[in-house]
Amino acid sequence: MSALERANELSDAEDHTQAIAYYEEAADAYALLKEERWNMLMCVFNLGLCLRQADRLDAAIGAFARALALAEDQRTPFDTERERKTVQCKTHDELGKVLADKQSFTESLHHFTTALDIAKTMRDSLELQGIIRRHMANVLEDKGDTDQALAVCGQALEDLQTAGSEPYEIHQTTVDLATVHIVRDEHATAVDLLHEAINGFESLPGTEFAIAHARASLANALRFLGRFAEAERQYALADTVFRRSGRQSSIAYNLQNSALNYAEQGKWEAADRTYSEALSKFEELGVSDYETGRTLMNHSETIRLAGDPERAEEVCRQAIAALNRAEGAGGLVGMALTVLGCCLKDQQRLPEAETALMESVRLIEQNEGSAYSLAYAEMDLGVVIADQCRFDEAAPHFERAREEFLRCGMHYEANLVNREEADALQRESERAHDAEKKDALLVEALSLAVRAAVDADERRFQFPASDARMRWIQRVAEPSRELALSLAADAQDAGLVSELVASWRTSGVVSPSSGLERARGGDPGRPPHHPAQATVPITGVMATDAENGVGGVGSVEGLGDPSGGVRGSANAAGRSIGPNLVMPHGSRSTLSAYAPDLALRRKVKYR
């Protein structure tokens, strides 16, 4: 048996490490024989496939580049010109995929476009065009161009169906289309498509691995719908297959997403453990600095929310170092600096936190990062400046954060800014000596706090599962209510206090005796000279958004203590108030109904 035959046999058995050795041996032999250009082409092309499976991406790019040069060389014999063009298309396609693995998206799209242009010159090439478009859609999605990704992937599915392609290709394209819908926050649609694909795969032989990848994507969609237990089951089913097959990269990425699922439930220990295992595998595989840095950043945020800001800072600095080595990761470095700023804030190293957050804003702007990333950085910067008793400087940052969130249609997050600013205004009012200024500050704070609290209360209807609804009430609605009641008490507005309590008692957010002592009597030590009145109606605030399922929860800010309580407004340590949930960067994971007003974001996905 020749080295090439043995390599092909090992490749079919998915023993990629041994196959690579035999392909390299065969390639060395063919390089000495000019008349063996065709065999040399097949050898280096298959070598590239195995190298990619082994996550040796640079070597894979080199192998495919050699294959492309041979396919374009007129001295390489082909039976027909169509055969030559087909090989060129497939080689450009493989180059596009491996470059996408390295996050070299511009180069990747160039190869897919070239492949598609060649395919269009061939008759009866609709199936080939569909496959190329499917891969192109994946890259467009990774770049954040989800409108184009949806159009291209939809066209790919139509091409394959029209061409009468194999069911496997159609089901795989359905999975990819579902992934685009996940990124677009159209999660119910994604769930339906993924169930359809899984059912289709199950009727075909040899599709266990494809089913596992579909389950991993299904888990992502379920996670975004707040159906964490179902997501956990799907991640576990996928993990079993991945480990049995020995696909280390699939194991690693599945662990990464599973860690997000744990973190969003506040299962910090499980999330920490799972992130650590994923990162260990990333190191073994030599995964890109971009992906490693992004995962380290999410891990850091989880550690911070678990109450260990010192360790979180250490991990976050590792993330920043990795991202600084990555190509085109400036915007992500800015996001990591947002997390670092929060770690420093939690340690009361406020000047350092301010410096980190200012640099975060600069980098996100400079690299044309997402509006929501900029908004989080601006909000956190406002918090840190306000915590240093410089509210006048903090106010423009709160305003910009609110504007950016609203521009993205992220109404919950805009109310998160309202809550932060209300807390800062309350503390500012406590420092004010002029009675009229104190009253004016309380009026403004109360307006913002009531708006945020009513919004948080109404969003409980977005949760079909009782455990998720209670988590929302305990970690979001109750802390928001406490701040609003505290401010109403400061303003000595007994009518507002009564209306708030009656409204939330009816909705089940408060019990008749939960935390109302201060609200009933106020703080006699700090009465305003002239009682302030609320400027926001109690009913109907943000109702249309809640009814439409707008917004999400969770924040880069972390917000609140692990038990979901609220720290006293005069104590800036460990702030701020709100949900103690993870908002992983680059994944925009949330705990609400995950409605379509959320901004675009990049996700790890399965193809």
Predicted regions located by residue number:
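Alpha-helical segment of the N-proximal tetratricopeptide repeat
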Residues: 2-28
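Inter-helical turn/loop elements of alpha-helical hairpins
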Residues: 11-21, 51-66, 70-71, 101-106, ...
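Amphipathic alpha-helical segments of tetratricopeptide repeats
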Residues: 27-31, 66-77, 114-124, 155-165, ...
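Short, charge-rich amphipathic alpha-helical segments embedded
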Residues: 28-42, 124, 505-518
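Alpha-helical solenoid repeat scaffolds used for protein-protein interaction
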Residues: 298, 310, 317-325, 330-333, ...
